From Swiss-Prot:
Name the record gives this protein: Poly(glycerol-phosphate) alpha-glucosyltransferase
Pathway: Cell wall biogenesis; poly(glycerol phosphate) teichoic acid biosynthesis
Reactions catalysed according to its record: 4-O-{[(2R)-1-glycerylphospho](n)-(2R)-1-glycerylphospho}-N-acetyl-beta-D-mannosaminyl-(1->4)-N-acetyl-alpha-D-glucosaminyl undecaprenyl diphosphate + n UDP-alpha-D-glucose = 4-O-{[(2R)-2-alpha-D-glucosyl-1-glycerylphospho](n)-(2R)-1-glycerylphospho}-N-acetyl-beta-D-mannosaminyl-(1->4)-N-acetyl-alpha-D-glucosaminyl undecaprenyl diphosphate + n UDP + n H(+)
Main location: cytoplasm
Subcellular location: Cytoplasm
GO molecular function annotations of the record: poly(glycerol-phosphate) alpha-glucosyltransferase activity
Up-regulation conditions: Positively regulated by WalR. Mainly expressed during exponential growth and rapidly shut off as cells enter the stationary phase.
The family this protein is said to belong to: Belongs to the glycosyltransferase group 1 family. Glycosyltransferase 4 subfamily.
Organism: Bacillus subtilis (strain 168)
Key words of the record: Cell wall biogenesis/degradation, Cytoplasm, Glycosyltransferase, Phosphoprotein, Teichoic acid biosynthesis, Transferase
Location of Phosphoserine modifications: S2
Entry EC number(s): 2.4.1.52
InterPro entries: Glyco_trans_1, Glyco_trans_A_1
Pfam families assigned: Glyco_trans_A_1, Glycos_transf_1
Length: 673
C-alpha cells in the first residue's frame, strides 16, 4: 500500500457526493484532528469541486463567531464548505416552538442599567422592582454580554440567560432555589421561540441533578427523547432522507461513532471512519474504550481510512483482513517551496511546536536537553504552544536550571518561520495519530529527532536520512542524537535536503489521488459485495454434525445449496460479540468439514486483552479480489453436546445455541482454586 502515482485524469476522480465530515464540535484551540478535517473540506471543494459539510453536534454559544473566523482566515472555502450544527441548523429551524420567550429584556436596556465592564457587575434593582436583582458577565472584549443572572430578594439564583457574541439570546436556565440547581433549560431560536426543553431531576446517589428527558417542539409535534444521542441520530436520519444524492458520512471523532453508525443506512449513504489516534491500550490486541464502537460496527462500515500504513496493519491484527480498509495520508496546507532550504538555520537551536499536553511527553524533551546543554552550553530550545502541562514543563525547566536555555514561547502564528530558523525539532510523544508538526518541520527542511512511537514517526522520519528515530523513552539516546546533529553541519545539510524530499510525498496532488483511489474503491467494493451476496443467497449455513475430540472441535456444515462457481474460499470465523475482534479463523478442510484446534486456531491473547465473553460463529464466503460476504452459522437443527471444554491457556468454552438458533461459545476464564 504505497502512495499512488498522480495523473491529471486521476485527480478529477473524486466521486460526486455530498461529504459530511463529523466531529462533536469546533474547539477554540483545535488540534490535529480538526486541522485535518478542515483541510480535507477545503481541498475537496477547491481541488475537486465537491460540496462538503463540517457537521457538529454540540451546543456552542460561540459557534457563529468561530465559523466566521474559519472563513475569514481561509481555513475553509465558503463556496464549497458549510459548517452545520444540530442546534443551529436543525432543531431550532424545524420547529413550531413551545412558546415565545416574552420575558426577554433588550440588551441595550440591560447595559444602560449596569454600565460597561469586563467583569460581572450587579444591578441592585431591576427597573424599580424591589424583589429582583441581576448580574451581568461579559465576553473577553468587556462589551458583549455573555450571560445575565437573575436573583430573588434572598440572593438565590432563579434564572440565567445566555447570549451569543452577536447578541442573540439562545439559552435560558431555570433554577430550583432550594437546591440551587437547574431544573429546566429552554433553548431559544432567532424568532424568540422556545424550540427545545431539557428537564432535570435530583439524583440522591450522585447528590446532583441529572437529565430526565428532552422535549423537541418539532414541525411534526412534540418529540420526547431520553438524551441528545437520540436527537443526533434523528438528524443523521433526516439528512440521509433529504434527497437521493450519494452521501458519505465520515466520522473523525470517535465519541461520535455511536450517534452515526447506529442509524439505519439509506441505500444512497455510505458510512466511514477516519482514524486519527492510537486505537489500542496496553498491547496491540486491546481495544481502547473510545474505539470499541468503530470495531463493533466494522461490518456495517463502507470504509475505514488510515493516515499511516502501520496503523492499518495493526487494525488487521484485531479485525482480520478487511476490503474496506484504505490508506489516505495527510497533506501539507501550503505549496512546497525549495527556497526554504536556503534560509539560514541557527546551529544550536531546537524548536518544538506542539500542544502542551501530557500525551506529548514534553518533560522528556526538557530532560534530554539538560544533557545537551552539558555538552553544548549555548544550545537553545524554544517550545511554542499552550496546554494543561504548561506548569509541569515550567517546573521541569526550573528544576534542571535551564531557564537560560529552554523557553516557553506561547502560541506562534508563523510556525514555518520557526522551523526554518531552527537546526532541528524534537518529538517525544507517547503516541500520535500521524505527527502533523513533524510533517510541517520536514516541509521547511527542518530535520526531526523523534521517539519511535505509534503512529507516524517512521512514516515521516527515516533514521539516518532526514533525522533520527530513537528508542522510545530512552532520554540519554535522545540527548546524544540531538548533540550529534547539532555538531555535524554536513549531516544537517543532508538531513535538511532529505526532509524536504520526504515532504514532497505528501503534496496536495498526491493527497487528492489517494482519496480518489480510496473513495472509488469504497463504492466499487460495496457494489461487488452486494452482487456477491446475492449470488451466495440469503440462507444461513447450518451445522449438520458437531463433535468434540480432546483439543479439537469438528464442525460439518451443509453448504450444498450455495453456488460454488463464484465462491473461491470458505472460512469459519469466530467474532467477539461486543467488538467483532476476529478470535478464530479456520479454512474449510473438505467439502463440509471445519476443524477448530483450540491451541492453534483460538487467539487467546485477544480474548484476554478484551475480556471476551461470547464468540459468535460465521461462515465467510470469499470471491476474487478479497470481496467477501458473511452468514451467521445456524445450530438449531443440531444437538450440541452441552459439554464445556477447557483449553490449556486457562479458558473454558461452552458451545450453545442462541435464542435465534445460531451457534456461539460462552467463554470464561478458569480461576485457580
Amino acid at each position: 500500500m504505497s502512495l499512488h502515482a498522480v495523473s491529471e485524469s486521476n485527480i478529477k476522480q473524486i466521486p460526486d457526493m455530498d461529504y459530511y465530515f463529523i466531529s462533536g464540535g469546533l474547539p477554540s484551540n483545535y488540534g490535529g484532528l480538526t486541522k485535518s478535517l478542515l483541510l480535507r473540506s477545503k481541498l475537496f471543494g477547491e481541488e475537486c469541486n465537491q460540496n462538503t459539510f463540517f457537521l457538529t453536534f454540540r451546543f456552542d454559544l460561540e459557534l457563529s463567531s468561530k465559523i466566521d473566523e474559519l472563513y475569514s482566515n481561509g481555513k475553509i472555502d465558503k463556496k464549497f464548505t458549510s459548517v452545520i450544527n444540530l442546534f443551529d441548523d436543525f432543531l431550532s429551524v424545524r420547529t413550531n416552538g413551545k412558546r415565545s420567550y416574552e420575558e426577554r429584556i433588550g440588551l441595550d436596556q440591560i447595559k444602560k442599567q449596569v454600565g460597561m465592564g469586563k467583569f460581572a457587575k450587579t444591578l441592585l434593582r431591576l427597573f424599580g422592582k424591589k424583589n429582583n436583582e441581576m448580574s451581568v458577565v461579559y465576553y473577553g472584549d468587556g462589551e458583549t454580554i455573555r450571560y445575565v443572572d437573575y436573583w430573588n430578594d434572598k440572593n438565590q439564583l432563579i434564572k440565567r440567560e445566555e447570549y451569543t457574541k452577536n447578541g442573540n439570546l439562545v439559552l435560558v436556565t431555570h433554577y430550583d432555589v432550594q437546591l440551587n440547581k437547574m431544573y429546566l433549560q429552554e433553548y431559544i431560536n432567532d424568532q424568540n421561540q422556545v424550540y427545545l426543553d431539557k428537564l432535570y431531576v435530583w439524583n440522591n446517589e450522585e447528590k446532583d441533578v441529572q437529565l430526565s428527558h428532552i422535549i423537541w417542539y418539532s414541525l411534526e409535534g412534540e418529540i420526547k427523547v431520553k438524551d441528545e444521542s437520540e436527537l443526533r441520530q434523528y438528524w443523521i436520519e433526516y439528512l440521509q432522507k433529504q434527497n437521493d444524492k450519494p452521501k458519505l458520512f465520515l466520522v473523525d471523532s470517535r465519541p461520535q461513532d455511536k450517534h452515526v453508525f447506529k442509524v439505519k443506512k439509506s441505500p444512497s449513504s455510505y458510512y466511514g471512519a477516519i482514524i486519527h489516534n492510537k486505537h489500542y491500550g496496553s498491547n496491540k490486541y486491546q481495544i481502547k474504550g473510545r474505539y470499541k464502537e468503530v470495531f463493533s460496527q466494522m461490518y456495517n462500515l463502507d470504509a475505514v481510512f488510515f493516515i499511516t500504513e502501520e496503523q492499518l496493519e495493526d487494525f488487521k491484527l484485531i479485525s482480520g483482513e478487511q476490503e474496506t480498509f484504505f490508506f489516505t495520508p495527510h497533506t501539507i496546507d501550503k505549496p512546497l517551496d525549495p527556497a526554504v532550504l536556503n534560509v539560514p538555520s541557527e546551529k544550536y537551536k531546537a524548536v518544538i511546536i506542539s500542544r502542551l499536553a501530557s500525551m506529548k511527553n514534553l518533560i522528556h524533551a526538557v530532560k534530554a536537553f539538560s544533557l545537551v546543554v552539558k555538552e553544548i552550553p549555548e544550545a537553545k530550545l524554544d517550545i511554542f504552544g499552550s496546554g494543561e502541562d504548561f506548569e509541569k514543563i515550567k517546573k521541569e525547566i526550573e528544576d534542571t536550571k535551564l531557564q537560560n536555555n529552554v523557553f516557553l514561547k506561547g502560541y506562534t502564528d508563523n510556525p514555518d518561520s520557526e522551523f526554518q530558523k531552527a537546526w532541528l525539532t524534537i518529538s517525544t510523544s507517547h503516541f500520535e495519530g500521524f505527527g502533523l508538526s513533524n510533517m510541517e518541520a520536514l516541509s521547511n527542511g527542518c530535520p526531526v529527532v523523534t521517539y519511535d512511537y505509534d503512529y507516524g514517526a517512521r512514516s515521516l522520519v527515516t533514521d539516518g536520512a532526514n533525522g533520527y528515530v530513537i528508542e522510545q523513552y530512552n532520554i540519554e539516546k535522545l540527548g546524544q542524537a540531538i548533540i550529534s546533529l547539532m555538531k555535524d553541519e554536513s549531516t544537517h545539510q543532508k538531513f535538511s535536503e532529505q526532509a524536504f524530499k520526504m515532504a514532497e510525498k505528501y503534496s496536495r496532488p498526491n493527497y487528492i489521488e489517494n482519496w480518489a483511489f480510496a473513495l472509488n474503491q469504497m463504492i466499487e467494493v460495496r457494489i461487488e459485495r452486494e452482487k456477491f451476496s446475492k449470488k451466495v443467497g440469503k440462507k444461513d449455513p447450518s451445522i449438520s454434525s458437531y463433535t468434540e475430540d480432546f483439543d479439537k472441535t469438528k464442525i460439518e456444515i451443509d453448504i450444498e445449496n450455495f453456488d460454488h462457481n463464484d465462491i473461491k474460499k470458505i472460512r469459519l470465523v469466530g467474532l467477539d460479540r461486543k467488538n467483532k475482534a476476529e478470535i478464530i479463523s479456520t479454512n474449510l478442510q473438505n467439502d463440509q468439514l471445519f476443524v477448530i484446534d483450540l491451541e492453534k486456531d483460538v487467539n487467546i491473547e485477544k480474548i484476554a486483552a478484551n475480556k471476551t465473553q461470547v464468540i459468535d460463529f460465521y461462515i465467510v464466503f470469499n470471491a476474487n479480489g478479497h470481496i467477501k460476504t458473511m452468514r451467521r452459522l445456524s445450530s438449531e437443527e443440531t444437538k450440541l453436546s452441552g459439554n464445556s471444554i477447557d483449553t490449556n491457556n486457562g479458558y473454558r468454552v461452552e458451545p450453545y445455541t442462541t435464542v435465534k438458533g445460531n451457534f456461539s461459545w460462552r467463554v470464561t476464564e478458569i480461576k485457580e482454586s
